[in-house]
Amino acid sequence: MSVNIKPLEDRIVVKPLDAEQTTASGLVIPDTAKEKPQEGEVLAIGPGRIDDNGNRVPLDVTVGDKVIYSKYGGTEVKYAGEEYLILSARDVLAVVS
């Protein structure tokens, strides 16, 4: 999936994965009780931040990676009818392989 959003510095555009709709026992979870997703797919990355010496610091993630991110990190945006999350690289906790 390609998105026409180009993040700046060390920011990352993530498409959150859908939250679970049912429990393991088959109970349907209403929207009001669902947890905010913390996993998503990286759709775009910025060029990286510039350190104190003027060197560009590359990001640890690449487009297509599945990541786990901080529960309350990032900014939710809606673009072209889709919902995305723009995160700082520091909000990404792990890459899922």
Swiss-Prot record:
Subcellular localization(s) per the UniProt record: Cytoplasm
Superkingdom assignment: Bacteria
GO molecular function: ATP binding; metal ion binding; protein folding chaperone; protein-folding chaperone binding; unfolded protein binding
GO biological process, one term: chaperone cofactor-dependent protein refolding
Chief localisation class: cytoplasm
Coiled coil start-end: none
Keyword Secreted found: no
Subunit architecture: Heptamer of 7 subunits arranged in a ring. Interacts with the chaperonin GroEL.
NCBIfam families registered for this protein in UniProt: PRK00364.1-2 (NF001527), PRK00364.1-6 (NF001530), PRK00364.2-2 (NF001531), PRK00364.2-4 (NF001533), PRK00364.2-5 (NF001534)
Similarity comment: Belongs to the GroES chaperonin family.
Function: Together with the chaperonin GroEL, plays an essential role in assisting protein folding. The GroEL-GroES system forms a nano-cage that allows encapsulation of the non-native substrate proteins and provides a physical environment optimized to promote and accelerate protein folding. GroES binds to the apical surface of the GroEL ring, thereby capping the opening of the GroEL channel.
Protein name, as recorded: Co-chaperonin GroES
Lineage: Bacteria, Bacillati, Actinomycetota, Actinomycetes, Propionibacteriales
